Amino acid sequence: MKVYLLLTLTFFSFDLICQNLYELDPNKNYLDSGKKLMNLDFGLHNLEQDSKNTEILIGIHGGDSRGFEWIYPLQKIDDDKMNTYFFRWDTTKCPQESIPLIMNEISKLEGIMKITILGHSFGGVLASLLLNEINQVKTDIHVIASPLASKDLEKYCDYIHPKTKNENISYFQWRTIQKIDFAFNNLDYDPQVIDFKESSVIRLPDKYRGNRLGHLWSISWVADNIDVIN
């Protein structure tokens, strides 16, 4: 009985720690699939354990994420040349506090030739702090519907968007229309707008698949259009 219980706990823990990207359902069971992502421990998780590639894709979620908004985008962007990862972090803390964790996790990966990072909302703020952290490896950083100019983050976290970036990094800002983004439309300024010349800025349209293109849908729209700029 003890052995059986131990095996049960072992497999249960493994299920929480390791998720397979293509076992996650973006459609009928999207809520349960989202929970599986958000139940992962804090850290960087390989969603394709059986694949060994030299390119990686990392999704960084925002605050109050339910996970499901990531399933379609990660599956859409993923291809046979890359491994897809999901970074779980404590969004109750300032983003600077999670930089050592993600950098330590990235440094453990061997043979990586290219990194693509997608940071959504608060996760984009964390991603922006990697502009001067990742060296040598070619890296594309995409921040999506992210409050990079947030007055609250500056006040409570001393967050100021970096002024420079490393030469190996390409930087892309994907901005929603503020008045239809419920995360930002109550503000008297657009917290997505910063002055950073070494980046490409893409303003998202107002509709996606016939619906309002708001905060959560923004990742899916980027997934459908990211190849246009690459």
Residue ranges and their predicted role:
Residues 72, 97-101, 156, 186-189, ...:
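Surface-exposed beta-strand edges and their flanking turn/coil or helix-capping segments
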Residues 77, 86-181:
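Serine-dependent carboxylesterase/thioesterase catalytic core
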Residues 160-230:
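C-terminal catalytic-base region of ester-bond hydrolases, centering on the histidine
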